[in-house]
Curated annotation (Swiss-Prot):
It comes from Mycobacterium tuberculosis (strain ATCC 25618 / H37Rv). PROSITE patterns: COMPLEX1_51K_1, COMPLEX1_51K_2. NAD(+) binds at residues 61-70. Belongs to the complex I 51 kDa subunit family. This is NADH-quinone oxidoreductase subunit F. Its EC number is 7.1.1.-. GO terms for cellular component: respiratory chain complex I. The lineage of its organism: Bacteria, Bacillati, Actinomycetota, Actinomycetes, Mycobacteriales. NDH-1 shuttles electrons from NADH, via FMN and iron-sulfur (Fe-S) centers, to quinones in the respiratory chain. The immediate electron acceptor for the enzyme in this species is believed to be menaquinone. Couples the redox reaction to proton translocation (for every two electrons transferred, four hydrogen ions are translocated across the cytoplasmic membrane), and thus conserves the redox energy in a proton gradient. SUPFAM superfamilies: Nqo1 FMN-binding domain-like, Nqo1 middle domain-like, Nqo1C-terminal domain-like.
Length: 445
């Protein structure tokens, strides 16, 4: 094993392995970042100062788009009084559903109180007195753990009325969704939270102006909010000492697939896949890297030529993809790229809400063409049809679900067109899917 140039920086994940790490007692035993100390510090500051700290830290959204968190908070109208004043809301998007994305669920399971503390600080900053954590309904253990942690926070006086004697009140609700991937899109999430079918809204108006119940609303990802307490305690300079100039700080990288030690690796933004694979023991023994996703199934594929691309928003963007949720799905040479993209296409076809014609119809036809290619009934024209349909989807719907379906299609043809041609000219898939399978303990099937 070589020496890693970029050290891991466990901050959010530092105490995940502690016994009963999810309890309030354990959270408050931490040495450097003792639980709820950041909240106590924030409550002594004016709300606008808290926003300024988060803005100056350079924290960017960890849910995919990478928008500046402090800037998003500052969009909330401040100073409204009288009849014109509307309540402000904070919503945490914990509807983690995309293939390959798996960082928020272990975070909430291991240390739910860091999320709750971040929620209280963020709500105080934007002057919200009601906050919601919207969780994917299937993850029942996460829901139970969050409910227990919220109950502990209420009992300790960190939630409810007059928190810490500051005069600030906050009610926090943990809400279970019904399992629709589309509800990970922020405006569809708001519709679901209001009791309607989850579908993306036309913007403008943006949630900061007309969000939940038509009121100013901030929507942030779990990891984004969980990063706030350490910034309040550690300070701007400490946070900016990690990562890159435009993408400062630390983040969770999720390695899965054909890797020796899959899991969550917390590191500064800008680390490379080569370095992360070094920490993870490399690609599984006897195999080599073929392609990978930098941010889950909705981001354009990269290849072994991109091992040294800095994994920050600018570096990955310059390489032709997106950092997204930092879900690094690793595929070795035994994987059929056509089969992999077909599986993702089936997912997006199933999860399309049907509101926008390009996405609804486009994902259906993409799936039909992939079925032909995999079963030996494809043609050379089908490859061009995939690109044509993807172009008809890209950027032509209310949300980015259709874009996510088109991205792996277009990028896989760009990098592996010969493999598509082999499916046409060879009468079907030339790969044996058993070669790429893994059993539960990571040993070849």
């Amino acid at each position: 094993m070589t020496t890693q140039a970029t050290p891991l920086t466990p901050v959010i994940s530092r105490h995940w392995d502690d016994p009963e790490s999810w309890t309030l007692a354990t959270y408050q035993r931490h040495d450097r970042y003792r639980g709820y100390q950041a909240l106590q510090k924030a409550l002594t500051m004016p709300p606008d100062d808290v926003i300024s700290i988060v803005k100056d830290s350079g924290l960017r959204g960890r849910g995919g788009a990478g928008f500046a968190t402090g800037t998003k908070w500052s969009f909330i109208p401040q100073g409204d009084t009288g009849a014109a004043a509307k309540p402000h809301y904070l919503v945490v998007n914990a509807d983690e559903s995309e293939p390959g994305t798996c960082k928020d669920i272990p975070l909430m399971l291991a240390t739910p109180h860091v999320l709750i503390e971040g929620v209280i600080i963020a709500a105080y900053a934007i002057r919200a007195h009601h906050a919601f954590v919207y969780v994917r309904g299937e993850v029942v253990p996460v829901l139970r753990r969050l409910h227990n942690a919220v109950a502990e926070a209420y009992a300790a006086g960190f939630l409810g009325r007059n928190i810490g004697g500051s005069g600030f009140d906050l009610e926090l609700v943990v809400h279970a969704g019904a399992g629709a991937y589309i509800c990970g899109e922020e405006t569809a999430l708001l519709d679901s939270l209001e009791g309607r079918r989850g579908q993306p809204r036309l913007r403008p108006p943006f949630p900061a102006v007309a969000g939940l119940y038509g009121c100013p609303t901030v929507i942030n990802n779990v990891e984004t909010i969980a990063s706030v307490p350490s910034i309040i305690l550690g300070g701007i300079d400490w946070f900016r000492s990690m990562g890159s100039e435009k993408s400062p700080g630390f983040t969770l990288y999720s390695l899965s697939g054909h890797v020796t030690r899959p899991g969550q690796y917390e590191a500064p933004l800008g680390i490379t896949l080569r370095e992360l694979l070094d920490y993870a023991g490399g690609v599984r023994a006897g195999h080599r890297l073929k392609f990978w996703t930098p941010g889950g199934s909705s981001t354009p594929l990269l290849t072994d030529e991109h091992l040294d691309v800095p994994l920050d928003y600018e570096g990955v963007g310059a390489a032709g993809s997106m950092l997204g949720t930092k879900a690094l799905e690793i595929f070795d040479e035994t994987t059929c790229v056509v089969r992999a993209v077909r599986r993702w296409t089936e997912f997006y076809k199933h999860e399309s809400c049907g509101k926008c014609t390009p996405c609804r119809e486009g994902t259906f036809w993409l799936d039909k063409i992939y079925e032909r290619l995999e079963t030996g009934r494809g043609s050379h024209e089908d490859i061009d049809k995939l690109l044509d349909i993807s172009d008809s989807i890209l950027g032509k719907s209310f949300c980015a679900l259709g874009d996510g379906a088109a991205s792996p299609v277009m990028s896989s043809i760009k990098h592996f067109r010969d493999e598509y041609l082999a499916h046409v000219e060879g009468g079907g898939c030339p790969f044996d899917p058993r070669d790429s399978m893994l059993v539960a303990n990571g040993v070849d099937a």
